[in-house]
Amino acid sequence: KRPKMVNSSQFAEMYNEAYRSSGEGKNFYDETALSKYASGEDPDLYPDVDWLDELYKDYAFSQRINLGVSGGGNIAKYYISGAFYNEGGMFKTDSMNEYDTSTYFRRYNFRSNVDVKLHRTTTLNVNLSSVFEKLNGSGSNSDTAGAGAGTIWKYAYICAPNAFPVRFSDGKFSGPSTNEGHNPYNLLTQSGYYERFWNNAQSLIGLTQDFSELITPGLTANVKLSFDAQNYNWIRRKKQVQTFTASKRDEEGNIIYTEGNVGQDNLDYSKGNTGYTTTYIEASVNYNRTFGKHSVGALFLYNQKQKNKTGVDKAEDALPYRHQGIAGRVTYAYYDRYFIEGNFGYNGSENFSPGHRFGFFPSVAAGWLVSNEKFWEPISHVIDMLKIKGSYGEVGNDQIGGNRRFIYNATVIDSGSYDFGKTAHTEKGLRVGDWANPNVGWERAKKMNAGVEISFFNALKIQADY
């Protein structure tokens, strides 16, 4: 709900009171001004503007539409869905504009999941999705993050109701007499427009093979390939409107104007875009099997990722970002009471020289489900679950240079100048920007965790970790 703002008559009365209290001993606004603010007979020289009412609607609409279809049989199953979301803004517009300054956000979603049974033991999964978004608004904002709503909101609240009219009666645009401040109506409706677009397309193809019949029960293999593409771009068509201030009327009753900001008829044009594509490959072999009271599991996984950026400024950012690694896990459980797990990761990063590119990161974990022990049965109706667990391992970080890549290479940049030769011709100088460090490698950290999980009456669960 919008707050109720004072009108010009109330503002002038309170301003006079504050002016007198400051030690001036007289009113800032004379009786003529107070009378005209109260009567509203000359809105050009004595305006009375509720800026919130001039800029904001009483309500805004939003719509959401979803549609989904699913089906299939023994061989193939599918699910397809689409969605549309539209959120209108609270700002008003000028119907005389030849461009759209209205504030709104729109999003379109699409998703398709298809599972195909290629063979009794072979399954193919194809998942596709895409999102498209558009944001529209005023061109008054100077950054790329939004459409000027914060700036307009600010001046709508700090602009006095008697500062100047929304617009003069002869059609001229009003504004402050100094460079400080803005007419919020001009910011909203006369400063051009801004459009921001964002889209993201994702695809994932997976193939799963069950080797339970061919080799041994519990053995499966999985291959995944994903491709993601994201793009963000914006355009701004911006202008500055010609503004005037009114000081008085001449003998014939015409307003005497003082020119404020110099305007322009054309719309400036600026744009920007960024984006990236990511390709990810993963292959894994899984084994899970139970032998009486013993349960064993194992996983071996290979992964590779490449990311390409667009709309970058630095040459090194235009090169692909690449990571590669393998991981493994072995698990064992006895009688659903005692658990042990070992993991390792062997990961490679392009940020380091070939001799330091890969790092090995092991970990181990163990747990005891005390509530599954026979001696726990007498109190199991009170404490139905108690588990003690702990883990220890190493983790690594390859982003140790901030935004810098290829730490093993030095960078050279322009720096200063020097005179050379008999004619003392000036040449540009060079210096090392970032020094090379061929011996740097993964940042390593040791992690330890000990914890307890407990459940009372099958209702209250508490978990504590250190």
Regions found by a protein language model. Name each.
Residues 243:
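Active-site-proximal polar cores
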Residues 1-198, 212, 399-418:
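Membrane-proximal, glycine/serine-rich, low-complexity loop/turn segments characteristic
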Residues 59, 113-121, 127-132, 141, ...:
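Extracellular/periplasmic, surface-exposed regions of secreted and cell-surface proteins
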